Amino acid sequence: MSFEVFEKLEAKVQQAIDTITLLQMEIEELKEKNNQLNQEVQQAASNREGLLRENEQLKHEQEAWQERLRALLGKMNEVN
């Protein structure tokens, strides 16, 4: 009788060990996925910063061209 109890206990312990092993593997996979996603987030943030700088530069260029155009139109009005 005690041998059967021991076998059942051993089977439960083995099942627990197998479950823990699978969970550890899943944790490692999730950690790797998390690291990958963090890298993607950092890359996206870096890209965003670059695009914001480029957008500001383009806005300044647009303002400069608008000023030039206004000046040119003003000169044309003076001629007429």
Swiss-Prot record:
Signal peptide: none annotated. Keywords: Cell cycle, Cell division, Coiled coil, Cytoplasm, Septation. Non-essential, abundant cell division factor that is required for proper Z-ring formation. It is recruited early to the divisome by direct interaction with FtsZ, stimulating Z-ring assembly and thereby promoting cell division earlier in the cell cycle. Its recruitment to the Z-ring requires functional FtsA or ZipA. One of its GO terms (cellular component) is cytoplasm. Gene3D superfamilies: 1.20.5.340. It is found in: Cytoplasm. GO terms for biological process: division septum assembly; FtsZ-dependent cytokinesis. It comes from Edwardsiella ictaluri (strain 93-146). Pfam families: ZapB. Belongs to the ZapB family. The keyword Nucleotide-binding does not apply. Residues 3-80 form a coiled coil. This is Cell division protein ZapB. It comes from the Bacteria. Homodimer. The ends of the coiled-coil dimer bind to each other, forming polymers. Interacts with FtsZ. Its main location: cytoplasm. The lineage of its organism: Bacteria, Pseudomonadati, Pseudomonadota, Gammaproteobacteria, Enterobacterales.
